[in-house]
């Protein structure tokens, strides 16, 4: 849609950003523009507009395998982008995750997570887990991915790991990473970024 209906047209200046969670967006190696989107660069700062943000999430302790589907492309002259909505300029940053409080989050299970050790009832539709996750874009095993660190504290009553892996019984599909919660991990960061981009867009008199 961006390449065919937006780039090179007046509507391109009206786009704050395209947030393409869990998607391989290709650029020439070492560049922030080209290949998939010829005129739409990667967002590298919060006040940038008419740009693209894309990421694929993996546990820091379980990076993408060499045969993984995310974070890489077959052509060695190209690579996928990684832009963390919580820190577009790079580096490790706390991400502000928001999860649905009901039904299975991502492990393809039917039961809801136990958000607290005493399984206290949750009455809100979403759950925040402040400080539980931090993430940064890294290159590992030839893949550019969002590496997710879990800051679990076994001593506190809160859930230590929400899940998000693709599982088939006991088997974990490592090449999928945390694809099922790509959006949830940075949900509030995406929401918070929009008014910043909107203010920048208005300031330019678009």
PLM features per residue range, with description:
Residues 1:
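Catalytic nucleophile loop
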Residues 4-159, 164-166:
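Surface cap/lid and interfacial helix-loop subdomains adjacent to catalytic sites
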Residues 138-139, 201-204:
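Extended, compositionally biased alpha-helical segments that mediate assembly or anchoring
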Residues 142-198:
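Extracellular low-complexity, Gly/Ser/Thr-rich intrinsically disordered linkers
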């Amino acid at each position: 849609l961006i390449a065919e209906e937006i780039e090179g047209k007046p509507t391109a200046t009206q786009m704050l950003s395209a947030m393409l969670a869990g998607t391989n967006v290709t650029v020439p190696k070492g560049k922030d523009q080209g290949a998939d989107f010829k005129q739409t660069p990667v967002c590298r700062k919060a006040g940038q507009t008419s740009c693209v943000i894309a990421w694929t999430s993996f546990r820091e302790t379980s990076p993408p395998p060499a045969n993984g589907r995310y974070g890489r492309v077959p052509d060695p002259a190209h690579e996928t982008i990684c832009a963390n909505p919580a820190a577009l300029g790079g580096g490790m940053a706390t991400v502000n995750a928001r999860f649905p409080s009901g039904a299975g989050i991502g492990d393809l299970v039917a039961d809801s997570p136990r958000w607290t050790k005493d399984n206290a009832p949750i009455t809100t539709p979403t759950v925040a887990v402040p400080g539980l996750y931090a993430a940064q874009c890294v290159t590992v095993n030839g893949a550019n991915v969002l590496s997710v660190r879990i800051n679990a504290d076994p001593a506190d009553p809160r859930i230590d790991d929400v899940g998000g892996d693709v599982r088939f019984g006991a088997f974990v599909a490592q090449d999928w990473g945390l694809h099922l919660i790509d959006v949830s991990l940075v949900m509030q960061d995406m929401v918070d970024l929009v008014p910043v981009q909107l203010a920048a867009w208005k300031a330019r008199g678009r």
